[in-house]
Amino acid sequence: VDEKILRSVLIAAVREAHQNRTLNEELKKHKASFNLIQTCKFHFQTLEEAECLAAFAAHCFPDPERVLQGLAELMINAVEHGNLEIGYERKTNLLNDGTWRAEIQRRMLMDEYQDRFVEVVITRKDNGIYAIISDQGLGFNWKRYMTIDPSRAGDNHGRGIAQANAMSFDKLTY
């Protein structure tokens, strides 16, 4: 092994390890900075953006791991069921056919849906942290989804709101 190459590789490895350590320390510092946020507002359109934002926004809450899945479910629902108007039965069929993602992509390009966005506002108040998720859809009968309905237990979806209500948040309202 050429000593010059080995030395170069080792120097690079040490430099990268130091950089990673520094970045991780900064990340920890920034995690604490989320407690300084009073209000923040986000707009997004896609499922990927919903997932990314959920992971980011979860850090605004005292227990990010607890709220992450609930935020993601509600944000994804806002895109697919709200803005893109994919109903429960339609989603069931799309999932059964393996065409759910393709249908999401198709609708995202349609004139009536392409300019729609979801807005998320997170606000810190004395009595808690609030996330308001608003889409531009037609609305739906949310009450039937707040708990897991045994008649839907075998369905391939339809538990996200109930799970968010039961496990992710102290209170979930529409």
Task: Please tell me what each predicted stretch does.
Residues E89-G158:
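Glycine-rich/acidic phosphate-handling loop/turn and adjacent ATP-lid/helix
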